[in-house]
Every structure is written in structure tokens, then in C-alpha cells.
């Protein structure tokens, strides 16, 4: 499995995976992802099996220690020099779940945050399923 950051070339695949993983009322739109990738594409962790995007995690960097609803909607709040790595969405296509891929992405994001000198990473989620630890 390859893990890499996002470019605008990944936009359609990212939006498609999000649409498959979240209900319409909760899923970020293609336009929101375009804005996110434009501001902080280096803070997307995309996992591929061959050429197929199977999972991803994204979030921006800020000096604010608490994740707020406003952060989901305003990619422009990203501050590359911020102390905290926010993590907004963790998506794995249904047929690839229960293989540890989400955990791999989280581990990579936390490791990258550590290497970049961040104070920590913040992930907030709504329980849709159960976490397997």
C-alpha cells in the first residue's frame, strides 16, 4: 500500500471515497475538498492499492488546541506553522475495512506531526461504527 499526500489530481477520488463513507448530510463536498487540498494538500494522507484510493485522512494545522465546527468549513484557517495537527475525516472504503488501514493512516499522521514538531494531533469523531483497537 502506498501512502502519499494529495494534489488536485486526487480531488475526484477523494470526493468519491468521502461520499461512499459518510451520509450526504455529513460528507464534505467536492468543492470543500478542492479548498482543503488547495490550502493543505500536504496534510492529506491518501492510501492506495495500485491506482485505487481506498482510504484517506485529512486535517489542517493550527495553534488552537481544540477542534471546532468552523474548522471543517474554513480551510483558510490552516496555519502551516501551527502547533496542533487537526484530523477531520478518516475514510476507508467499506470493502477495505477491518484490515488496519485506518490505524496505519492515523499512525502516519501522528508520526508526521511529531516530526514536524507539533504539540499533538486532535481527532474528533461521531460514532458510526465501533473502533477496533
Placement of each model-derived feature along the sequence:
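Glycine-rich phosphate/pyrophosphate-binding loop shared by adenosine-nucleotide-utilizing enzymes
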Residues: 1, 52-56, 85
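A short beta-loop-alpha structural element at the N-terminal edge
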Residues: 1-14
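Helix-loop element at the rim of GNAT/NAT acetyltransferase active sites that forms part
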Residues: 16-30, 36
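Conserved beta-hairpin
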Residues: 43-57
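Conserved acyl-donor/pantetheine-binding loop and adjacent beta-alpha core of acyl/acetyltransferases
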Residues: 57-90, 97
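Conserved acetyl-CoA-binding loop-helix of GNAT-fold acetyltransferases
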Residues: 92, 98-111
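Conserved GNAT acetyl-CoA-binding A-motif
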Residues: 106, 113-126
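Conserved small/polar residues in nucleotide/adenosyl-binding loops
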Residues: 127, 131-133
Amino acid at each position: 500500500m502506498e501512502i502519499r499526500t494529495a494534489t488536485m489530481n486526487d480531488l475526484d477520488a477523494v470526493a468519491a471515497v468521502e461520499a461512499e463513507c459518510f451520509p450526504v448530510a455529513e460528507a464534505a463536498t467536492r468543492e470543500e475538498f478542492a479548498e482543503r487540498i488547495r490550502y493543505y494538500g500536504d496534510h492529506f494522507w491518501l492510501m492506495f492499492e495500485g491506482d485505487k484510493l481506498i482510504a484517506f485522512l485529512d486535517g489542517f494545522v493550527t495553534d488552537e488546541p481544540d477542534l471546532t465546527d468552523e474548522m471543517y468549513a474554513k480551510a483558510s484557517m490552516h496555519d502551516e506553522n501551527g502547533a496542533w495537527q487537526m484530523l477531520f475525516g478518516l475514510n476507508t472504503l467499506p470493502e477495505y475495512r477491518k484490515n488496519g488501514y485506518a490505524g496505519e493512516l492515523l499512525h502516519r499522521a501522528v508520526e508526521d506531526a511529531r516530526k514536524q514538531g507539533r504539540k499533538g494531533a486532535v481527532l474528533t469523531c461521531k460514532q458510526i461504527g465501533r473502533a477496533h483497537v
